């Protein structure tokens, strides 16, 4: 039997502010369903992803900003970071695991010199403080 993650729910404080942020991040709006007061579902999908995110009203009791350590993988971290910064999104500096082969939680500034998959990353947060890590993964070399 196979399993796949379909949707992750993010707790947010203001649906419209979050919607604008994730659209600026490049996510496509799949659903914006608001059948009654107090209930709204917004679902978005990152480009190229099989998994979506959702947020809204009446979906979760979790506090806004409590979804931490979410990952988005990109084929070129420097290019992705530059594009997001140009769109007005605050993205932390790029860092990489060191040493990669025996990594124990230490980082060095910049991209991994060998551009190994899963070694380089940069962080960002949505307006509520839900955190994301952009991680460089070249699918050609990760296989």
Pin down the residues of each PLM region.
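Generic signal for short, ordered secondary-structure residues
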Residues: 1, 63, 107-108
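Hydrophobic alpha-helical segments, principally membrane-spanning helices and signal/leader peptides
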Residues: 11, 61, 110-111
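Vicinal oxygen chelate
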Residues: 32-33, 72, 81-143
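Acidic di-acidic motifs
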Residues: 14, 76, 126
